[in-house]
């Protein structure tokens, strides 16, 4: 029975409303490992699946989860109820390329000046 309290049932809600899981994860599981699970279990029929952990953001209880933290760090009192499943929202962000990082056009062209007379 002690094992139940050391695990958390998590389902991952994708942007289209479909889910991955639920699946049990030990309290010591890092957020980075959760993201690896999302990548490995991403539905094959869905386009634009994530390729790396950096492309995946997990949100739980309104907080963006940090890769280095564990499931235990984000556990809520509600998750201790029998049969409780925690839903984490999955956001995919495409990696930013070097071309996108560079500002477009001449920086002087984007200035705005106001004068009151």
Curated annotation (Swiss-Prot):
Q: For the modification Cysteine methyl ester, which residues carry it?
A: 114
Q: Which CDD domains does the protein's record reference?
A: Ubl_MUBs_plant
Alphabetic keyword roster = Cell membrane, Lipoprotein, Membrane, Methylation, Palmitate, Prenylation
In the bilayer, the protein is annotated as: Lipid-anchor
- Matches recorded under InterPro entries: MUB, Ubiquitin-like_dom, Ubiquitin-like_domsf, UBL3-like, UBL3-like_ubiquitin_dom
Q: Which GO terms describe its cellular component?
A: plasma membrane
Pfam families associated with the record: Rad60-SLD_2
Q: Where is the lipid attached (S-palmitoyl cysteine)?
A: 112
Q: Where in the cell is it found?
A: Cell membrane
Q: Which residues form the propeptide?
A: 115-117
Its predominant location is membrane
Covalently attached lipid (S-farnesyl cysteine), positions? 114
UniProt keyword Cell membrane present: yes
- Please state every residue range assigned to the domain named Ubiquitin-like: 8-74
| The keyword Hydrolase appears for this protein | no
The family database entries (SUPFAM superfamilies) matched by this protein are listed as: Ubiquitin-like
Q: What else is known?
A: Heat stable and remains soluble at temperatures exceeding 90 degrees Celsius.
* Role according to the record: May serve as docking site to facilitate the association of other proteins to the plasma membrane.
The name on file for this protein is Membrane-anchored ubiquitin-fold protein 1
Q: What is the lineage of its organism?
A: Eukaryota, Viridiplantae, Streptophyta, Embryophyta, Tracheophyta
């Amino acid at each position: 029975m002690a094992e139940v309290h050391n695990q958390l049932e998590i389902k991952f809600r994708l942007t289209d409303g479909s889910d991955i899981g639920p699946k049990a994860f030990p309290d010591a599981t890092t957020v980075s490992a959760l993201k690896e699970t999302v990548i490995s279990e991403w539905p094959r029929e869905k386009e634009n699946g994530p390729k790396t952990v950096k492309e995946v953001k997990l949100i739980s209880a309104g907080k963006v989860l940090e890769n280095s933290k564990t499931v235990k760090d984000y556990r809520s009192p509600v998750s201790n109820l029998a049969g409780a499943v925690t839903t984490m929202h999955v956001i995919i962000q495409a990696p930013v390329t070097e071309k996108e990082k560079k500002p477009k056009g001449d920086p002087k062209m984007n200035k705005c000046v106001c004068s009151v007379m």
